[in-house]
Design a protein with these regions (language model features):
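Cysteine protease catalytic core and zymogen-processing segment of caspase-like enzymes
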Residues: 1-12
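Phosphate-binding and adjacent anionic-ligand microenvironments
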Residues: 15-207
Length: 207
């Protein structure tokens, strides 16, 4: 998926091309990037959802890569805007240099980070007059665990991101353009994906 591609692109720049500099990612993207940041000793900056937040942060920090959950990526020494053609060329170059097909590249990435990542998202409609009630419900929720994982912290940069043990997370946020609430999660355990999402819907009162 697009989050794993983001991880591969960051790995390509840091490991293969020897770049050294910050990574910028939206709050809804993979924690694989945080692990790569720790491994290569580079800062990882997290922004709200949308390239309108990513691009300025890239310029401010001179980041080597910036990206968002929808699969848009931008790169240092290039325009601070999504460029799918360049991203595709970088993936092809990574395949060429390591002589690996995409599935093998992921194995290499997961071997480097020490873990796999499994991601999914659920979109749910709601009556527009219920938005404030949903926000209050999520804001006041105080779960000790989600999906059987201990809650570590809550980030309200854009919506409500519940950071869980092991780098797993659940994000609940509203669409900026339509009456839809989006529930995202990433976990190292594929069997926990649907449970985490269901708990997220329950927290929002939408299950």
């Amino acid at each position: 998926n697009q989050l794993r591609v983001f991880g591969l692109l960051a790995f390509y720049l840091l490991e293969v091309r020897g770049a050294h500099g910050p990574i910028v990612k939206t709050i809804s993207t993979t924690s694989l990037l945080n692990k790569l940041g720790q491994i290569y000793d580079v800062p990882v900056y997290e922004t709200g959802v949308g390239f309108k937040f990513v691009a300025p942060k890239m310029t401010e920090t001179n980041a080597i890569i910036g990206g968002e959950e929808s699969g848009g990526f931008a790169f240092q020494h290039h325009v601070p805007e999504r460029d799918g053609i360049l991203a595709g060329l970088y993936i092809l170059d990574l395949m060429r240099l390591l002589d690996q097909k995409p599935s093998q590249l992921l194995e290499t990435l997961f071997s480097k980070t020490g873990t796999e990542s499994h991601y999914d998202r659920v979109d749910s409609t709601f009556p527009s007059d219920q938005k404030e009630k949903i926000i209050d419900r999520v804001h006041n929720a105080n779960p000790s665990e989600i999906g059987g994982l201990t809650l570590i912290s809550v980030d309200t940069t854009d919506g409500f991101k519940f950071n869980l043990e092991g780098g797993d997370w659940l994000l609940i946020r509203f669409s900026g353009t339509e009456p839809i609430i989006r529930v995202y999660c990433e976990t190292t355990d594929a069997d926990k994906v649907q449970k985490i999402l269901q708990d997220g819907l329950s927290i929002a009162g939408l299950s």
